[in-house]
Amino acid sequence: MIARPARDVLSSATKKQFRFRGCLAARHEPYHTSTSRAGQVAILPATTDDKTLVSVFDSPRSNAKLSAFATTGLFNHSTVTHPRALNSIAQGTLIRAHVLTNRILRAKESREELFKVVKNLDRLSDMLCSVIDLCELVRNSHPDRAWVEAANDAYEGLCQTMNELNTHVGLYDVLKIVLSDPEIVKSLSPEAYRTAMIFWNDFEKSAINLPAKEREEFVALSSEIISLGRMFLEETTAARPPAKIPPSDLAGLKDKGMGVRLQLQAQFTQRDLHVYPGSLQAQMIMRSAPAEEARRRVYIASHSSTPEQIELLERMLSTRARLARLVGRESFAAMALDDKMAKNPTNVARFLDSLMDRSRPYARRALRNLSMRKQEHLHTPPFPTIQAWDRDYYCPPEPPAPPIPLPRLTFGTVLMGLSRLFRHLYGIHLRPVKPIAGEVWHSDVHKLEVVDEERGVIGLIYADVFARRGKASGAAHYTVRCSRRTDDDDVQGDNDELTRMYPDLIKQSEEFEAVGRGPIPGLPGTYQQPLVVLLCEFARPSLGAAVLEWHEVMTLFHEMGHAMHSMIGRTEYQNVSGTRCPTDFVELPSILMEHFLNSRQVLSLFHADSTSSSSQPIGNHDEDPCHSIDTYAQIMLAALDQIYHSPAALQPGFDSTRKLARLHDEKGLIPYVPGTSFQTQFGHLFGYGATYYSYLFDRAIASRVWKDVFSSSPLSRETGERYKQEVLRYGGGKDPWEMVSALLKAPELASGDAEAMATVGRWKIEDEVGLPGRH
């Protein structure tokens, strides 16, 4: 059965997906913002906790070392003090999972137990997930190879059990009994019923109701897809042969640094210059070579593939299609979209067609402007065709910049701004605390308590933000522990002879699971406290505080959007907590956070002493004239993803390159370049097969939410509270269409049908063309 990955980031294409993984503070009176004289918005002053973020995170730590005398283990698990502990905990967890599985299988013998099946399935999922997610984090961040290897071993063993549970006929049969019983179904809360249906749908996707031979084929095909996908991902970054550039084509390079050096090299050797795709030289030539032929050669070299690379991709696509046909679906897209907001490929097509129709005029206008630049440069007849290799030369990509002048933003300053923003919106702030010796895996790692003004500490964030050898690249939000209600677990009912045979292993597993539990003021029962890790690769400062580039500030806001979703989405079932929601909904909170950086009022929060700010909106300070071209290119990629995962993948003679060329011929604005095959570098085809539209989709919704809900008063507690109550608090425990419909007061969206998808497509261009351009 399939579950939401713990790492929520679009680039996490290599991550497996699982379903069966699967302290109180003083109470404060709620804060309220107010508007003072016209044009000014009153801002809550920075608190001591806010200012402490700056001093703690901006203090030099380059020489800091972890204590050799640990008093606790990772994430305050007292038993996780040594790599071997991961193996012991994994073994104990597997035993307990086996016992709980047997209990669920026996539930058909007891009506009382049938009422507990959904809860126990979620417990089983969480029991395994909690260890898998910890191991996943260790695999990607720990500097000690012994820890990484131990995490890998534990991870693989637990995943094997997951795969067995994914196709467990007995569990499926018990759940079928539960969902066929009107009395039991009526007793389930909406959140519990949604959890049950998630398990049911994932079982159905796993060929659970097919004969044994077909189930074996399903497992074999699934394993083959994973293997092909890994090989495909390796090839997406494989070196391509160099472009050979004659010295004469390097004349007039606009770059006076590297360009001059290349010209001198070519003059000295009198040989063709070999330029490797992806290199700094290749990027420089695409941006600054007046000679079109030089750019054409680099472009073709950068988008070339070997026959073997193309064949590998097409094997992966056809194997996915065979898997879908095995379970009775027309295509892999139909199978993948069944539990998404989009529901089916037809609805995705409506969204993308609507998006294309609205985006095309703006992209054409931008291309016409580039054509005029090309005409002036080459002295051609009017409006020469813009080719794929012209884009960066006539409109060089620029790094994103803040919409208004700002002082240098240190990491601590940005965290202070985020804390102040969360206080305005949700009555929540960030409080730095010193980790106990042994609690973190590197001296760079900081610990933050997430503090609610009424409920005290509601979660923990560990921030590991500086690049280092062996650490995963990119930025990501890892969910290490999910919210879940635990006081009604009925652990006593798990008693089994097996647990008495391995008391030490069972004890370790139970102690591991018990960490982070406690009451929540205002709610009945006991809950697991969510714990997330923020991994980034910001440049480590050689001296003083880390100063962030604007794109890094945007990244931090994005990832903290995921973190707040995890903190506020305190559900009773871990399978729907926080970011455990559909792929085409999970990016909404994180993308929405980026929009706040377009507000003067929010930007003023980076100044510790600010108490007021102009409420005047920021205009199009630096609108990128080519932004619409890039947006259209993203829509084309999403359309290509749908084509590749359609029934066409099983047609005789399926040719992925021909499909790419045909898409460009029918809907593209820049001509396809014969001989190129970019699709072999489109890594998201593996990790986000048939769902690449999701990022565009959530961008569209976030744009509308910002425009209609937040833009006029981005620091309003009333508005923030409405967003928290209508969206964030549910995690994945409610239909996303119902959440969006309620938030936007648009009841026509609630059904989430094809027309709703088309409506969202129309939002995209209406909002985005007015936003400052970002590359």
UniProtKB/Swiss-Prot annotation:
The keyword Ion transport does not apply. Signal peptide: none annotated. Zn(2+) binds at residues 558, 562, 565. It catalyses: Release of an N-terminal octapeptide as second stage of processing of some proteins imported into the mitochondrion. Binds 1 zinc ion. Keywords: Hydrolase, Metal-binding, Metalloprotease, Mitochondrion, Protease, Transit peptide, Zinc. It is an enzyme of class 3 (hydrolase). Belongs to the peptidase M3 family. Cleaves proteins, imported into the mitochondrion, to their mature size. While most mitochondrial precursor proteins are processed to the mature form in one step by mitochondrial processing peptidase (MPP), the sequential cleavage by MIP of an octapeptide after initial processing by MPP is a required step for a subgroup of nuclear-encoded precursor proteins destined for the matrix or the inner membrane. This is Mitochondrial intermediate peptidase.
